[in-house]
Amino acid sequence: MKGRVLVAGFATRHVAQSACNAGYEVCAVDHFCDQDLAWYTKDREKFDELEDLPDAIDRISRRHSFDLFVPTSGAEDLPTTLLLCGTPRDRIQRFLDKLDTQHFFESCNVPVPGLRGPGEFPAMVKPRRGAGGWRNAVIRDEHGMSAWEMLYPDVPFIRQELAFGVPASVCCVTDGTRARAIAVNEQYLRGSGESAFGFCGSVTPFEHPQQARMIAYAEQVAAASGCRGTIGIDFVVGDDAVWAIEVNPRFQGTVDTVEMASGCNLFDLHVGACRGVLPAPLARPHQVAARSILFADRDMTLDTDLSPLKNYCADIPWPGTFFEEGQALVSVYGCGQTREAALALLDKHITTVRQYMR
């Protein structure tokens, strides 16, 4: 065993699995505590609201000593006496505020959608804080703006010009001054409703004519960010343009497809980068990996045990879990030698899983 690590945040399964596969003993503090999180962890603490997270960390820390602390979404800027393996709080703050991130991109001379002023439409409206794109919306007039502000009262936001293209990201590791791109990913978004811009899956690798520009911008941004470990830079990629959208200064939702496609272990790369060691350029991915998050299409209680589908599912809920309509239910995967083959197998697996959700 390489040591005992505590992974804490809203969702931790993907990081806990990577850490376990890297040879660490893992404990987790997690909002969901799904079945498969228990497979990769020695101990777990569940919490409901983010304000409960510090107390949950305190409870598990009284039961175990830890060699490393790795925060995920929701825990990035928590004060801790544990040995942090990731980006220090004083460097992470500007990437938790989308306006500060906007100014950072501009200071790096990296293309970014421009800010819109009051009354300028259409505009992409985003809360200044928050992950996953769940409250982002394209607003086309004052009526739509007023409706958004009524739906999310007292939420500070930014307004940007629209960028048209494919959502994508680059996974990097950085030691604080240098960076190495690990994988380029296509991102899937919900596409409709209040969560139209919410993350719901990825394909790795993402082959695109602008791939080299994305990698160059991502490594430039990651090296200048002052972050440590694995981080993700989100883009929108057009036919002849690239726009930087966001910096995720933590493990990203693309961990699974990056590891499946490349064969690397991101947790090992993360720890190495935090200790000042960057990997050599990775070989070309040996396969294409695709992930899709399935959501409840109605209020429902899932009585079926999905664990027999573990070869192509993750984030597996416990039987008897209640889901509100629109809540994330389970992740499904497909792999193949080509994008088409991976997506075909993904569709086949989704069909199988849906039979258990009736």
Model-derived features: where do they sit?
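ATP-binding N-terminal substructure of ATP-dependent carboxylate-amine bond-forming enzymes
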Residues: 1-96, 100, 324, 337-358
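A short beta-strand motif that forms the metal-chelation/ATP-contact edge
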Residues: 5, 126, 172, 241-251
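Hydrophobic anchor at the start of a short beta-strand
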Residues: 25-29, 112, 123, 157, ...
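A conserved helix-loop-beta module that forms one wall/lid of the active-site cleft
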Residues: 85-150, 156
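ATP-dependent carboxylate/phosphate-activation module, predominantly the ATP-grasp catalytic core
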Residues: 161-226, 248-274, 282-284
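Short acidic-glycine loop/turn motifs at beta-strand connectors
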Residues: 174-179, 237-241, 275, 296-298, ...
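A short glycine-rich, hydrophobically flanked beta-strand micro-motif that places a catalytic Asp/Glu
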Residues: 227-239, 282
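Peripheral (often C-terminal) accessory segments that flank ATP-dependent C-N-forming ligase machineries
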Residues: 269-358
